Amino acid sequence: MPPFFLALTLSLPSYAGALKPYVIFDMQAHSETVPIKDAMEDWEGNSFERGENQWVSAWFETGLRYKRWGMGFVKRYDFDLRFSEDTAELYWLSANKNPLPLGRNFNVRIKAKAIKASGLRVMFSDALGQSAFYSLGLTYLKAHYTVDGGITGFADVINEKDYEFDLLIDYHYTEDTLFDRVVEEPSGKGFAVVAEFNYQFANATQLHVQVRDLFANIYWDESPYTEGLATSNRKEYDENGYVSIKPVLSGFEGIDSQTVQRLEPRWFAQLSHTFAGPYGGLFQYRHQYERHLFGLGATLAVGEGEISTSYWAVQNALEISWHCRRLGFSVTADQLDESDLKSIWLSLSYGR
C-alpha cells in the first residue's frame, strides 16, 4: 500500500475497521499479425497472418474504500496500433527481407495512440433498489508519454527487393521515432471516468457491466508534432541488394501550445447464470480498440470460491479464472508456447 494510504489509515483509528483496502491489476497484450515476441523484435520472424490490430494495456490501482466512497492511486499504460492489412504485409516482408510481390501497390494506413499516465481516482457507489448497484469513478491523470496520429499513402514495388512510397504524416509525440527529432517532453493533464453497473435479475442470473474511459481526455501543453509528406528518396542497400529506406520529410515540425488526446471507451459485460448444484454458465463481451470480442464459458462453485473457464472465439484463446471472497485471479492465452503467443491477458484483484 502506498505511504499516503497507510498514513491515512493510521490517522483515522475510529474508521480503520470500516476502511477496506483494494488492489486491481489488469494487463493485456494482443497482436493479430505476428507473435508478441516477434512484435517486440521489429516483426522479425517466420510467422505472419493478415491482420489490422496490435495493442498493449496495463492498469494498476490500489486504494481504500469507506462505505460508499473510495480513493485510489492509478498507474496506466495504453498502446493502440491499427493498420491496414497491406501495411502489415509490406512491413513484415521488408523487416524479414522477403521477396516483394512484383507490381504490387500497397495501401498504407496506420493509426497510433499511446499514453503513460498516473493519478488519483475518487469513486462513489450505491444501490438502486434491491437488485441494482452502480459505481462511478473520476481519475485525475498526469501523463508523461504520448503518441497520437497517423500515416496514410501508397507504396509501389519496383522489384523483389525494392519499393518506393509517398506518405502523408500527421502525429503528436513525446519521442519522434520516425525522424529522430530531438524535442523536450510535453506535459499532459486530464481526466477519465469509469462506470460500473450490476443487476441481479433473479437469484441465479446476474449482469455486470464496466466502462473504462467512458469520458477521457488528456490535455497536452507544448506538444511536438510533425505534419507533411514523407518520401522514399533516401535509400540504402545491403550486400544482397535489399532496400533500407530513411524517409525524407517535406512539411512542418512544430510545437502545439495545447492539444487534446481523446481516449476511446473500453466496454466489458458479463452475464452469468447458476444452474442446479455448483454448475453455471457465463457469457462475456468486450469492445475495445475497434474490436468486438466474445467469450463463452462455464463455472464451478468450489467451497467459498468459484472456478471458471471461457473460450474467446476471436482470439482463439482460453481463459481460466478463480474467485474466492475478495480475491480474484484470471489468465487468458491463445498458445502455451511463448514463441507463438499472440494474445495474453492477466488480471489480479483484491477487494474489488
Q: Could you say what each language-model-derived stretch is?
A:
Residues 1-18:
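Gram-negative bacterial Sec-dependent N-terminal signal peptides
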Residues 17-183, 228-246, 265, 331-352:
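A subset of solvent-exposed loop/turn segments in beta-rich extracellular surface proteins, enriched
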